A protein has these predicted regions:
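Alpha-helical secondary-structure segments
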Residues: 112-119, 146-152, 192-193, 220-223, ...
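Surface-exposed binding/hinge segments that line
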Residues: 88, 132-176, 198
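N-terminal lobe/hinge region of extracytoplasmic solute-binding protein
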Residues: 40-91, 121, 187-190
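Ligand/substrate-recognition segments at binding pockets and active sites
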Residues: 201, 252, 325, 343, ...
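Structural transition elements
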Residues: 314-348, 366-369
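Gly/Pro-rich hinge or "lid" segments in bacterial periplasmic/extracellular proteins
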Residues: 73-74, 78, 165-219, 223, ...
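Extracytoplasmic/peripheral linker and loop segments enriched in polar/acidic and small residues
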Residues: 384-396, 401, 421-490, 512
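Ligand-site clamp/hinge motif
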Residues: 211-257, 375, 384
Length: 512
């Protein structure tokens, strides 16, 4: 079935369910006085430990439980105070962090300098940490006061404040880590407005209000309950019927259909989220740059955007969208759609009769449809792709940990600081570099160079170089930037999207 045919089918299903469930929605939405945000979530978390999880989709569940040391502005991603009241570079190799007083973890333990030091050392050195590269420039973490920590650096690193606005800055109770050990991923204890109740894998994650939260009045919600619904049409039905009252990662077809419904508010916002294919270039045949280049030339990104995003997205040529201050727009010229060029590159690489490749991907309907479009485009260039599908957590483990397959069709969800994207995707020791190969030492250096400066023009020059090196080496297949499309019941108030495209529920309330 073509992308256009899939779109029409999807739209018809959505319109039908609106008509069928509208009356049920009105009855269900009037029930209960507790403010419970019930979220239809498309993916089961890979883990509830922010330092050991490998899926960008985990953030939506992690944010309510784990505050970060540094916050960020939702529109600009510029850093702002969080668990830290302030931070400053005492000198180019010393970053001083001042911790907000009076904060406790959900288990009653105090957030102090020792707790922060413990967490940052865990990120840097724990065997289970998948984000070690984020703090690669840190030589030592020292508690230099009861509420002060100083990071001693190997070299200047201007990206650290925004690195601490992501997973590396999510603080976990040291007591809980010591108590639960490897089971801490199922027993999360943070400092956020919501504390953990239960996680039934592939079914639900339930959180309840943390009464001793340090930001009084920040949330009016009594609870957040995530129901794992991988089929997005079923997820829409759950919101229209009143079973849930919030859904994210809607398809563009559903946005068009639901925009005419009075039963749900639908919003669209641009984001850093991109659909990508990761390559294992540590093994044949993708260790040959010509094969990787051929795959890139075989994809018609404009047609892909129309088929999968109905034109609401933007063709992706690099990690950053064209509107981002650090985007190198020249990279868009590297891989124009050219089937004959793709075939020629394969022939040069010794595959004149084409090539068979084994990829993996998720098993939900949306992902399978995306895989079908990729298969059809690659076939025209004599690239015969076969996908093995499964749940997100399974696919993530099989490809990135167990090294199975030539590549995986997934996503890159972006990070507040652009340099982190390049480090996490392509660094030799990164979790996302399945082959654990350093194709380009110059790329590694360019990323490090981008962190030496605070001036944006100097940072951009280094990041421009990084993007060129990624393109020249065809280190992955960027496909399309996906807009954040969300929907919620009219009673849900105060939701604001962010540029990362990962929903946060700060300030959300539910009217009666």
């Amino acid at each position: 079935m073509t992308g256009q045919g899939l779109a029409h089918l999807d739209r018809r299903r959505v319109l039908a369910l609106i008509a069928a469930t509208a009356s049920t929605f009105r009855a269900a939405s009037a029930q209960g006085s507790r403010q419970v945000l019930r979220v239809s979530a498309p993916y089961n978390p890979s883990t509830l430990d922010p330092h050991t999880g490998g899926a960008g989709s985990d953030h939506v569940v992690l944010y309510p439980m784990f505050d970060t040391l540094v916050g960020f502005d939702p529109e600009t991603l510029q850093p702002k105070p969080g668990l830290l009241t302030a931070w400053k570079y005492a000198d180019p190799l010393s970053l001083v962090l001042d911790i907000r007083p009076g904060i406790t973890f959900h288990d009653g333990e105090a957030l102090d300098a020792e707790a922060v030091r413990f967490n940052l050392e865990r990120v840097r050195a724990d065997a289970r940490s998948v984000i070690k590269t984020e703090l690669a420039t840190v030589a030592a973490v020292e508690a230099t006061g009861p509420l002060q920590v100083t990071l001693r650096l190997k070299q200047p690193d201007s990206a650290l404040p925004l690195i601490l606005a992501d997973r590396a800055g999510m603080m976990v109770s040291p007591k809980a880590i010591k108590q639960f050990g490897p089971d801490s991923d199922r027993n999360p204890v943070g400092t956020g407005p919501m504390k953990f109740v239960s996680w039934a894998a592939n079914e639900s994650v339930k959180l309840t209000r943390f009464e001793n939260y340090w930001q009084k009045g920040q949330t009016q919600l009594d609870a957040i309950e995530f129901t794992i619904i991988t089929d997005v049409v079923t997820g829409v039905r759950s919101v229209v019927s009143g079973q849930n009252n919030f859904i994210y990662q809607l398809r563009p077809t559903q946005q068009q259909a639901l925009s005419r419904s009075k039963e749900m508010h639908v919003g669209v916002a641009q984001s850093l989220y991109s659909v990508v294919m990761y390559f294992n270039y540590g093994r044949p045949p993708l260790d040959d740059v010509r094969v990787r280049m051929a795959i890139n030339h075989a994809i018609d990104r404009e047609a892909f955007n129309k088929a999968i995003m109905m034109g609401l997205g933007a063709p992706a040529h690099t990690v950053l969208p064209a509107s981002h201050w650090a985007c190198n727009k020249d990279v868009a010229t590297y891989y124009k759609y050219d089937v004959e060029r793709a075939k020629a590159l394969l022939a040069e690489a010794g595959h004149k009769d084409g090539i068979d490749l084994e990829f993996s991907g998720y098993s939900d309907q949306r992902s399978v449809q995306t895989q079908e479009v990729v298969i059809a485009m690659l076939r025209k260039a004599n690239i015969r792709a076969k996908f093995t599908t499964g749940a997100l957590a399974v696919v993530t483990t099989e490809y990135f940990t167990n090294k199975k397959g030539d590549g995986t069709l997934a996503a890159w969800t972006g990070r507040p600081d652009p340099s982190v994207s390049f480090a996490l995707m392509f660094n030799k020791e990164s979790f996302l570099n399945a082959g654990k190969v350093e194709i380009s030492p110059e790329l590694t250096q360019a990323v490090l160079d981008s962190r030496k400066y605070t001036e944006l023009d100097k940072r951009k020059a280094a990041l421009d170089r990084a993007q060129i090196l990624v393109a020249e080496n065809a280190l992955y297949l960027p496909l399309v930037f996906q807009p954040e499309i969300f929907g919620h019941a009219p009673q849900v108030k105060g939701y604001k999207s962010n540029l990362l495209g990962k929903p946060r529920f700060d300030g959300v309330s539910i009217s009666s």
